[in-house]
């Protein structure tokens, strides 16, 4: 679904435009820290081999206007805004408002509907986001939760992060003990487990 929304629309740009549909799209990835939002963004970017990709995070968020101008000129393009809640808090939480919020809204609105531009936003805190960003059509078209992994997902992650280390065939206990744990935490747990085994004279 994510790849289709980000890449599929661009692949069918000519047909969609001819039929009167807009190309500009906004995608919001949300979920607790460490669940894999950034990894998902990287996966999408890796597939967009023909797109201009602009990533804004931290202090770089202040560059939203020139970044969007560049994205309009170099389509197809993807503008990634990481931790968008840093600049797009609801005005009830920040009565004075954040000038960058208005810059973001103006930048998104300034992109023509038929421009092959994707705004890819991430956040850990959907509750504080400005309604004008997430509820107005034409800004965020699709919001997708990146949740903590379920049991099957945790087992896959344990095996993935073990890399070449030898694991017991039955990971039932480890899967149960990691209930509610994020993907990044599982990666760190596996690193510590392998280190402990090596310190104890074991092999991998």
How would you label these PLM feature ranges?
Residues 1-172:
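Walker A/P-loop NTP-binding motif of AAA+ ATPase domains
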Residues 147-203:
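Conserved C-terminal "switch" segment of AAA+ ATPases
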């Amino acid at each position: 679904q994510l790849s289709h929304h980000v890449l599929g629309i661009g692949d069918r740009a000519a047909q969609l435009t001819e039929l009167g549909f807009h190309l500009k799209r906004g995608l919001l990835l949300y979920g607790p820290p460490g669940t894999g939002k950034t990894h998902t963004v990287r996966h999408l970017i890796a597939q967009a081999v023909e797109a201009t990709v602009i990533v804004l995070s931290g202090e770089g968020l202040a560059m939203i206007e020139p970044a969007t101008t560049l994205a309009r000129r170099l389509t197809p393009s993807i503008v990634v805004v990481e931790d968008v809640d840093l600049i797009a808090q609801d005005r009830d939480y920040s009565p004075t408002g954040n000038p960058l919020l208005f810059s973001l809204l103006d930048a998104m609105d300034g992109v023509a509907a038929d421009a092959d531009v994707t705004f890819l936003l991430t956040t850990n805190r959907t509750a504080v986001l400005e309604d004008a960003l997430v509820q107005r059509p034409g800004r965020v078209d699709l919001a997708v939760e990146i949740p903590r992994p379920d049991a099957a997902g945790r087992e896959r992650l344990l095996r993935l992060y073990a890399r070449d280390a030898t694991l017991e065939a039955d990971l039932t206990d480890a899967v149960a003990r990691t209930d509610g744990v994020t993907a990044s935490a599982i990666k760190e747990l596996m690193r510590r487990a392998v280190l402990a085994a090596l310190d104890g004279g074991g092999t991998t």
